[in-house]
Amino acid sequence: MASANSKESLNAFFNNELSFIQTTLNKINDSFDESSGVLTRKEDNTVKIEIIEPFKEIYFINNDGIEIHDLEFNQIKIINKTDLINNSMYNFINDGFSKEGLNIKEIDDSSFSIEENNNFFYFEFINEKVLHIKYKDNMNIDNLIKFYKK
């Protein structure tokens, strides 16, 4: 089992090709929405996130920001890094979990929380191949992402 409070364990986990399922609570119609995809970190530390369902999208993440390809509408959108300065998920994915002063609180042997930019993230290693992350996004929507090593 990966050590819950280990930044190295998180960074090592995210250096693998990962499949994921993201579940969000839609408070408008009181339902759960799901998306799924694959996250791959390349040797140059850029990240490709391919959303498979419900919409076909590809996100390219690097030090310059995020490039979003909507494959169904054949559109590309670019978000510059300066617009993502307080986006914790971007920071975690792009920079890893080695940021100086990252506020990690161990809960038990397999779970911990991180507070960054007044946002709280709950991490739980289910086992060495599965990691769950729970958080509220910038629109106060509850998110659960289940990552699986391939």
Question: Each predicted region: which residue ranges?
Answer:
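Gly/Pro-enriched, hydrophobic low-complexity segments
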Residues: 105-150
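Boundary at the C-terminal end of the N-terminal hydrophobic targeting segment
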Residues: 2-6
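A short, Trp-centered hydrophobic/proline-enriched beta-strand micro-motif
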Residues: 11-32
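Short, solvent-exposed coil/turn segments at beta-strand boundaries
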Residues: 14, 40-46, 61-65, 107-109, ...
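Flexible, surface-exposed loop/linker segments and immediately adjacent secondary-structure boundaries
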Residues: 73-112, 117
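An acidic-aromatic
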Residues: 40-87, 138-143
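Short, surface-exposed charged micro-motifs
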Residues: 36-38, 56-58, 103, 120-124
